[in-house]
């Protein structure tokens, strides 16, 4: 027991649980809903293995059940499982609604953080541009004229080219009816003052599931969608 390797992070504990109980936990992909009270089952089965403590198990379980992939699996009709994968009852509507709100709040936090980071980058770039010292240009010495040479007439300066009219800021059309959308359709998702390209994956009663160019998918309400 003394020579057993120690798991130092919740992610390592989750990977261990996925290997130890593959019919219950998964290290990637959509996760299955867990039995209510599964923490006590875990304590009885694995406490002491890999030098695991109750605190480590509780932290790993909290991280696992708050992940997006776990919350995606909380759907009406889905069945909870125990450590061995045996069914332990269907999810009720209250738990499904709670998971949906958790997922929406988590996505909103991520979008807000990204918008804040982009705003800080723009502010930093603007500040660096204003504070950068300008180099003074030294005047060039005038060329010496040969007294015997004739003065050449100055060439007329070409007329200044007309500056092109500034491009009008692109305006986006808000999506008023999500039922008019179709799977595979391209649109944009508003995040702060920015609009990110996305593709429609699914139209649900809660909104539209889209996939960003980064590969991340999320459910977005109609007021955050534009063309």
From Swiss-Prot:
Record SUPFAM superfamilies: FinO-like (SSF48657)
Region (Disordered) residue spans: 105-179
SMART domains: ProQ (SM00945)
Xref: Pfam families: ProQ (PF04352), ProQ_C (PF17516)
InterPro entries in UniProt: ProQ (IPR023529), ProQ/FinO (IPR016103), ProQ/FinO_sf (IPR036442), ProQ_C (IPR035236)
Domain of life: Bacteria
Chief location category: cytoplasm
Disulfide bonds: none
A single GO cellular-component term on record: cytosol
Compartmental location: Cytoplasm
Molecular function in Gene Ontology: RNA strand annealing activity; RNA strand-exchange activity
GO annotation terms (biological process): post-transcriptional regulation of gene expression
Ranges annotated as spanning the membrane: none
Biased composition (Basic and acidic residues): 144-159
Keywords: Chaperone, Cytoplasm, RNA-binding
HAMAP family tied to this protein: ProQ
Family: Belongs to the ProQ family.
NCBIfam families registered for this protein in UniProt: PRK04950.1 (NF003434)
Functional summary from the UniProt entry: RNA chaperone with significant RNA binding, RNA strand exchange and RNA duplexing activities. May regulate ProP activity through an RNA-based, post-transcriptional mechanism.
Protein name per the record: RNA chaperone ProQ
Organism, as annotated: Enterobacter sp. (strain 638)
Record gene name: proQ
């Amino acid at each position: 027991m003394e020579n057993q390797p120690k798991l130092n992070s919740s992610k390592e504990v989750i990977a261990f649980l996925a290997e130890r109980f593959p019919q219950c936990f998964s290290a990637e992909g959509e996760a299955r809903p867990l039995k209510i009270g599964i923490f006590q089952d875990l304590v009885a089965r694995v406490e002491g293995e890999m030098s695991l403590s109750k605190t480590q198990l509780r932290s790993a379980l909290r991280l696992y059940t708050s992940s997006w992939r776990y919350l995606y699996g909380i759907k009406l009709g889905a069945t909870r499982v125990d450590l061995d994968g045996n069914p332990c009852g269907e999810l009720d509507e209250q738990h499904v609604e709670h998971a949906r709100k958790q997922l929406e709040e988590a996505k909103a936090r991520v979008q807000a953080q990204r918008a804040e980071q982009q705003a800080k980058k723009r502010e930093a770039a603007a500040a660096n541009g204003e504070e950068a010292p300008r180099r003074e240009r030294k005047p060039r010495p005038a060329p010496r004229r040969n007294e015997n040479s004739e003065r050449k007439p100055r060439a007329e300066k070409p007329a200044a080219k007309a500056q092109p009219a500034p491009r009008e800021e692109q305006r986006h059309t808000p999506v008023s009816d999500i039922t008019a959308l179709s799977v595979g359709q391209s649109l944009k998702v508003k995040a702060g003052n920015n609009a990110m390209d996305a593709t429609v994956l699914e139209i649900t009663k809660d909104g539209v599931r889209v996939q960003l160019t980064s590969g991340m998918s999320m459910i977005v309400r109609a007021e955050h969608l534009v063309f």
